UniProtKB/Swiss-Prot annotation:
Effect of residue 73 to L: In isolate SUS19
Enzyme class, UniProt record, top EC level: hydrolase
Binding site for Mn(2+) 2: 266, 400, 403
Keyword Manganese found: yes
Cofactor note: Binds 2 divalent metal cations per subunit. Mn(2+) is preferred over Mg(2+). Optimum concentration of Mg(2+) is 10 mm. As the Mn(2+) dose increases, gp2 converts supercoiled circular plasmid DNA to nicked open circular DNA, subsequently to linear DNA and finally to completely degraded DNA.
The organism's taxonomic lineage, starting at the top: Viruses, Duplodnaviria, Heunggongvirae, Uroviricota, Caudoviricetes
Gene assigned in the entry: 2
Subunit field text: Monomer. Interacts with the terminase small subunit; the active complex is probably composed of two decameric ring-shaped terminase small subunit and two monomeric terminase large subunit. Interacts with the portal protein.
Protein's recorded name: Terminase, large subunit
This protein's record includes keyword Transmembrane helix: no
Gene3D superfamilies: 3.30.420.280, P-loop containing nucleotide triphosphate hydrolases
Region (ATPase activity): 1-198
Taxonomic source organism: Bacillus phage SPP1 (Bacteriophage SPP1)
């Protein structure tokens, strides 16, 4: 029996990822990146190996079924050849199926455009425990994918089996795309492993591919960064290059010493959440530190006041959205939050506030303390005009903690020579 050295089949980068996969510490393995990184090639090989290791059925999905045969089906056939195990596999085209002959378990294929067919899959002998969604960004919402996941995650598996989900995609350019918001975050679920790869980590590429990549880099660097490096550039300009987002970057000891407090409140109604934020401002270092947050939908004024009092935040001034004067009055008169006042908005106050934040030396955020602040500051992008060119104003969605932060630092913006009245 011929032995195949995986170190000769995998790139060094993906050999390390394969070791992580084999360690079985995660449910979800998300591989994203630019063109030529070979992420899909490696997932296909891993699926072949896992099918030979475990008595499971593997489900492979594209958003639209009629794209399956010429993409993932061919990719998996190629993986069988690359691993030199073609004699152990049966290829069927009607329906599309790859069967591991010694055991009889199969790789099956479906389209996300017919979820009922996914829900109705029955594989009593070999449970559907593996799944690969290729071109994940083709799905319009995270909820679409969640429905499919729940269709697979059913009963407890027999010994020797485990659930394992692969996802692969090239990041869309828009930062607000759901896949970018979910998987570019500093705050990932413990069951999810995310890897980003580029063609620069693939030693098996042709000289022609590399020359083409370098030519694109020379002609259009933004296109190169998006297509070949897999960067979600959004408008092409990063709103906050001064972000420092890292788990544990703000310690309890530091929070205990923070004494230059700024607090802001953006009222939420309907689909918009309420956002209360608490920051420390280090004027000497020109940095701000996110300390705490309350971000949720349908938060009553009583709950807001209870949160402020419970955490002993009422002694510091709160600057709130002035478009809700009745809510401000109610917090003050009915709920005893006396140090609250409305923000003084002007025609250019939004742009001035965003510019002030951008000119800080650092915006320091610990996603374990303030996950919503981290998510919004990471994912926000500039608005664009009809030609797709960025304009100096942030998108007016998923920006509630950012708005609350602008309110919190209103007085500092005026003192720094930036007028909220323009």
């Amino acid at each position: 029996m011929k032995k195949v050295r995986l170190s000769e089949k995998f790139t060094p980068h993906f050999l390390e990822v394969w070791r992580t996969v084999k360690a079985a510490q995660h449910l979800k393995y998300v591989l994203k990146g630019g063109r030529g990184s070979a992420k899909s090639t490696h997932i296909a090989m891993w699926i072949i190996l896992l099918m030979m290791m475990m008595p499971i059925t593997f489900l492979v999905i594209r958003r639209v079924y009629n794209t399956v045969e010429q993409s993932v089906f061919e990719q998996l056939k190629e993986a069988i050849d690359m691993l030199e195990v073609g004699h152990l596999w049966k290829v069927s085209k009607s329906p599309l199926r790859l069967t591991y002959i010694p055991r009889g378990n199969s790789i099956i294929f479906r389209g996300g455009d017919d979820v009922q067919k996914i829900k109705s899959i029955k594989a009593s002998k070999f449970p559907v425990a593996g799944m690969w969604i290729e071109e994940l960004a083709e799905f319009k919402t995270e909820e679409e994918v969640s429905v499919i996941e729940k269709s697979v995650l059913r009963a407890e598996l027999p010994p020797g089996c485990r659930y394992i989900f692969f996802y692969s995609y090239n990041p869309p350019k828009r930062k607000q795309s759901w896949v970018n918001k979910v998987f570019n975050s500093s705050f990932l679920p413990a069951n999810t492993f995310v890897d980003h790869s580029t063609y620069l980590q693939n030693p098996f590429l042709s000289k022609a591919f590399i020359e083409e990549a370098e030519e694109v880099k020379r002609r259009n660097e933004l296109k190169y960064r998006h297509e070949y490096l897999g960067e979600a550039l959004g408008s092409g300009v990063v709103p906050f290059e001064n972000l420092q987002i890292e788990e544990g970057i703000i310690t309890d000891a530091e929070v205990a010493r923070f004494d230059n407090i700024r607090q802001g409140l953006d009222f939420g109604y309907g689909p918009d959440p309420l956002a209360f934020v608490r920051w420390h401002y280090d004027k000497r270092k020109n940095r701000i530190y996110a300390i705490d947050e309350l971000v949720d939908h349908k938060v009553s004024l009583k709950r807001t006041a209870d949160f402020v009092r419970k955490n002993k935040y009422e002694s510091a001034r709160i600057i709130a959205d002035s478009s809700e004067p009745r809510s401000i009055d109610a917090l003050k008169l009915e709920h005893g939050i006396n140090r609250i006042e409305g923000a003084k908005k002007g025609p250019d106050s939004v742009e001035h506030g965003e510019r002030w934040l951008d000119e800080l030396d650092a915006i320091v955020i610990d996603p374990l303390r303030t996950p919503n602040i981290a998510r919004e500051f990471e994912n926000i992008d500039y608005q664009t005009d009809k030609n797709g060119d960025p304009i100096p104003r942030l998108e007016d969605k998923d920006n509630h903690t950012i708005d609350a932060t602008r309110y919190a630092f209103e007085r500092d913006m005026k003192k720094g020579g930036v007028s909220l009245w323009g």
